[in-house]
A protein has these predicted regions:
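Juxtamembrane regions of bacterial inner-membrane/periplasmic proteins
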Residues: 2-282
Length: 282
């Protein structure tokens, strides 16, 4: 009899083992379903983390750009501009002044002939003292002229040209135009009109490898920027649309014609007022 009980227990244990062994494949069959469900939930989580990281990175870069640009414009309210992106680009392109390299000598506005700002305003931006950086009337006129099939002409103000010359690259694009508008707003807000004109006349390209009023006066006319005559100032400004093609040292007939036109326009332009007589900007 005890032997029979033992055999029954043995058979029962075998049956239990068999049942458990039969049940294990089912549990193993269910595990892939749980793994698949887990992976399907982690994928959106990973994507969310990646997108969050990218968003934070973009916002950080934008904030960094805003801080650096504000500090740069604020510093240039007083600090002379000795180098511009265009100077570096021209150097890489091999455009050099006589004797190699570039010629650039910063001088304060008081050391520049008073006729040069007048000539620049007459030729480039006759509403310079009135607008806030953008001449909307000139922009509209240029747009309407282009729509009517006329020649495409620029409507950039002296403020816009200064922003481009000091902070940006020369090649035109919608991206650069956007940055140009941003920097134009900043310099009009932080700088006086006199400071904008001072930076403009000291940084603008006036010949191959020649930048600024003092450099062009010494290189082409053998005098200081203060000693430039009225007609010489008009001739220098006449080259500004394309100073690599037009030369104030060897002017063509077209250049002489443009010089005379600028001198006529200068009669209606007053001298740039002293900064003390204008409202100070922050």
């Amino acid at each position: 009899m005890p032997v029979q009980r033992s055999s029954r227990r043995s058979s029962a244990s075998k049956n239990g083992t068999t049942k458990r062994s039969k049940a294990s494949p089912k549990s193993r069959a269910k595990s892939p379903t749980r793994t698949s469900s887990h992976s399907s939930t982690t994928f959106p989580t990973k994507m969310k983390r990646i997108l969050t990281f990218l968003l934070k990175t973009c916002l950080g870069l934008i904030a960094l750009f805003l801080v650096i640009s504000l500090l740069a414009v604020f510093a240039y309210k007083w600090v002379p501009v000795y180098y511009t992106p265009l100077m570096v680009i021209r150097q890489v392109q091999g455009v050099e002044a006589r004797g190699g390299g570039w010629q650039h000598r910063w001088v304060p506005l008081d050391s520049i002939s008073p006729y040069l700002p007048v000539a620049a305003i007459a030729a480039e931006d006759q509403n310079f003292l009135k607008h806030n950086g953008f001449d909307y009337r000139a922009i509209l006129d240029a747009y309407e002229e282009a729509q009517e099939g006329g020649r495409v002409r620029g409507a950039s103000t002296i403020s816009q040209q200064t922003a481009k010359n000091v902070f940006l690259w020369p090649h035109s694009s919608w991206v650069r135009k956007g940055f140009e508008a941003y920097f134009t707003v900043l310099i009009e807000w932080m700088w006086s009109k006199q400071r904008i004109m001072e930076v403009y006349l000291n940084s603008i390209e006036m010949g191959p490898g020649v930048y600024g009023a003092e450099a062009v006066a010494q290189e082409y006319f053998g005098c200081s920027a203060r000693g430039l005559s009225r007609s010489q100032c008009a001739l220098i400004v006449a080259t500004l649309p394309n100073p690599l093609e037009y030369s104030s040292k060897h002017p063509s007939r077209y250049m002489r014609k443009r010089q005379r036109w600028i001198e006529v326009q200068m009669r209606a332009i007053p001298f740039l007022p002293k900064e003390e007589k204008t409202s100070q900007k922050p």
